[in-house]
UniProtKB/Swiss-Prot annotation:
Transmembrane segments: none annotated. The keyword Nucleotide-binding does not apply. This is Holo-[acyl-carrier-protein] synthase. Keywords: Cytoplasm, Fatty acid biosynthesis, Fatty acid metabolism, Lipid biosynthesis, Lipid metabolism, Magnesium, Metal-binding, Transferase. One of its GO terms (cellular component) is cytoplasm. It comes from Paraburkholderia phymatum (strain DSM 17167 / CIP 108236 / LMG 21445 / STM815) (Burkholderia phymatum).
Length: 135
């Protein structure tokens, strides 16, 4: 595999909390995909802090992914077109849908992601890869 691009992002959890308060919770619906939103609601129901940490990490991954593929938050990269889900082992994985999935497939781009959060911050790192074209 060849590296297509890398991206990293750090989010202050208190800023996400402030945006959630300012938007009466609509921020989560704006940025999370349907599977992410279900997990967010389940975690938030158990603990507001866990819900905010989940939202902050997923927001961070979307930002890092957009940097890794070189588009920023421009078409076809949209908030809800990329979800960070977990494999049964717990390993996070980026799952694209719609036009973003098509754009990535046309270029043979796959990704690897890592994310972490602490009380005050959420951080993520994404590597976008393409098949090695060397002979």
């Amino acid at each position: 595999m060849a590296i297509y691009g890398i991206g990293t992002d750090i989010v202050q959890v208190s800023r996400v909390a402030a945006v959630m308060q300012r938007t009466n919770g609509r921020f989560a619906e704006k940025v999370l995909g349907p599977d992410e939103l279900r997990v967010y609601h389940a975690r938030h129901a158990r603990s507001q802090a866990r819900g905010l940490a989940f939202l902050a990490t997923r927001f961070s991954v979307k930002e890092a992914f957009s940097k890794a593929i070189g588009l920023g938050m421009r078409w076809p990269m949209t908030w809800r077109a990329l979800q960070t889900l977990n494999e049964p082992s717990g390993r996070p994985t980026c799952v694209a849908s719609g036009e973003l999935a098509d754009w990535l497939a046309e270029r043979g781009i796959t990704s690897r992601v890592t994310l972490s959060d602490e009380r005050d911050y959420a951080v993520s790192f994404v590597i976008a890869e393409t098949p090695d074209t060397a002979d």
